[in-house]
A protein has these predicted regions:
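Transmembrane alpha-helices and immediately adjacent membrane-cytoplasm interface residues
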Residues: 1-11
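Charge-rich cytosolic interhelical loops and cytosolic tails of multi-pass membrane proteins
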Residues: 11-90
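Short acidic, glycine/tyrosine-flanked loop/strand segments centered on an H-E-D-like triad
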Residues: 144-156
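Membrane-proximal, non-transmembrane alpha-helical segments
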Residues: 56-138
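Hydrophobic, lipid-facing residues on alpha-helical transmembrane segments of integral membrane proteins
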Residues: 2-3, 108, 116, 150
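Cytosolic/matrix-facing juxtamembrane and C-terminal tails of multi-pass cellular membrane proteins
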Residues: 137-138, 153-185
Length: 185
């Protein structure tokens, strides 16, 4: 639960930096995640199928109030996808992946510090530390130390803001695609 809270803090900062939720951004004509023709088709579908919805159909129709409708439309699609998890498995999978990377990024520094403590502990337990032996005779003396160093490198290199942002937009895109499959309201 603590890690989820840290992940949600990351999410809030990301939204502030982006200026909106990725689920809102992908419906904007200024965003290229979804091509213009598909986006216009999605806007038309949403306007037809969701009561009282008025998404802009052309680029020139978009204004500062459009985000309110985009967010409302995506909230509807999210509720629909959650209620139909059996048929919307991709959306659910993308959501789980986004949540995983968001939460992992949220606890990144704690994980690195813990891995570093374990690596230092292992280093202290090794008699006559030798870099040559670490590569040539790794097992069993150096295995845990090398493993912790690899974990630290992976956390530093792979777990970053870009992967969280990428997963957020993948989820947003798959959620937007739901509008082609949902039933009339």
């Amino acid at each position: 639960k603590v890690v989820r809270i840290w992940g949600k803090n990351v999410e809030i900062k990301m939204y502030e930096k982006l200026g909106a939720k990725p689920t809102t951004i992908v419906l904007r004509y200024s965003d290229s995640t979804i091509d213009m023709l598909t986006k216009t088709r999605y806007h038309k579908y949403i306007n037809e199928k969701i009561k009282d919805m008025d998404l802009p159909i052309m680029v020139d129709d978009e204004n500062e109030k459009s985000d309110i409708f985009y967010e409302s439309a995506m909230n509807y699609l999210r509720k629909y996808a959650n209620a139909h998890r059996d048929s919307e498995q991709r959306v659910y999978q993308d959501l789980k992946e986004y949540n995983f990377w968001r939460n992992l990024y949220g606890c990144k520094w704690i994980a690195i510090i813990m891995d570093a403590f374990i690596a230092v502990r292992e280093l202290c337990l090794i008699d006559n530390f030798n870099v040559r032996d670490m590569f040539l005779n790794m097992y069993p003396t150096y295995v845990m130390f090398v493993f912790m160093m690899i974990c630290i490198m992976l956390m530093c290199i792979v777990v970053n803001k870009n992967i969280v942002k990428q997963r957020a937009f993948e989820y947003a895109k798959s959620l937007a695609e739901v509008c082609e499959r949902f039933v009339e309201v």
